[in-house]
Amino acid sequence: MAFKYQLLLSAAVMLAILVATATSFGDSCAPGDALPHNPLRACRTYVVSQICHQGPRLLTSDMKRRCCDELSAIPAYCRCEALRIIMQGVVTWQGAFEGAYFKDSPNCPRERQTSYAANLVTPQECNLGTIHGSAYCPELQPGYGVVL
């Protein structure tokens, strides 16, 4: 009788592991999965225009709206990761490096660009929810272990 319950429990545990594994692959916040390759182009343009005062001659409100629209199209659980990718980059499962789009320039340090990008989900910018349940990506803030 005990063997029967052990077998049933083992089967239930294996099924739970299988389900968890299957769902985690579909929810991967990687370029080509839940994120597009080369994500957040409008946001990169918006950040550079705000911090470096370079880029297209568009109204700031138009650039911000495009960025927020682009960021809102990304699942909430991947928004912080999408911002991290444009700031620091990532090696995809195919082995290709993507991201780290902000570059140092004499009048526009990369640190200022990445700091601004980290705040795009906040209420002052796009006010979008994240995996943290609020408009905040704490792991992207200086001092949280992020190398800028």
Curated annotation (Swiss-Prot):
It comes from the Eukaryota. Five disulfide bonds, which are essential for the inhibitor activity, are probably present. One of its GO terms (cellular component) is extracellular region. The keyword Nucleotidyltransferase does not apply. InterPro entries: Allergen/soft/tryp_amyl_inhib, Allergen/tryp_amyl_inhib_CS, Bifun_inhib/LTP/seed_sf, Bifunc_inhib/LTP/seed_store. SMART domains: AAI. The record marks 57 as: Interaction with trypsin. It is found in: Secreted. GO terms for biological process: defense response. Keywords: Disulfide bond, Protease inhibitor, Secreted, Serine protease inhibitor, Signal. Residues 1-24 form the signal peptide. The keyword Acyltransferase does not apply. GO terms for molecular function: serine-type endopeptidase inhibitor activity. Expressed in the developing endosperm. Not detected in embryo, aleurone, coleoptile, roots and leaves. The sequence heterogeneity suggests that more than one gene exists for this inhibitor. The genes may be alleles, or multiple loci could exist. PANTHER family: TRYPSIN/FACTOR XIIA INHIBITOR-RELATED, TRYPSIN_ALPHA-AMYLASE INHIBITOR CMX1_CMX3. Inhibits trypsin in vitro. Probably plays a protective role through inhibition of insect midgut proteases. Belongs to the protease inhibitor I6 (cereal trypsin/alpha-amylase inhibitor) family. This is Trypsin inhibitor CMe. The lineage of its organism: Eukaryota, Viridiplantae, Streptophyta, Embryophyta, Tracheophyta.
